[in-house]
């Protein structure tokens, strides 16, 4: 595995306070390291992620940032998992660590897909050939 600079691990932790919800230390570390590696390979900075729109498909008027959207998704996923546990208990158990990690990792590939051009996020050359659902898995 490629060495990850500690700076990017710190950035991932700062972007994702929800990592603390993951109790499994190994899964928390892998989730953090995946984000850190994506940050290390990306042209996008943490500040870019706090300001760029969460999708390129909605047009220039969209004001919801990538990180606001992503963190909301993680909170909604966690709430849904807790509610499933409340209703289904042991009949349909929810692995909350896996649920939270999956929600955090869902769009990590966008860090490789997007580039900044004239202060705006655009789909980069890499993203034209391999979109984020696939690059995020790799």
Task: State where each predicted segment sits.
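Acidic/His-rich, divalent-metal-binding segments that scaffold phosphate/diphosphate chemistry
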Residues: 1-123
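Divalent-cation-assisted or electrostatically stabilized phosphate/pyrophosphate-binding catalytic cores
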Residues: 120-138
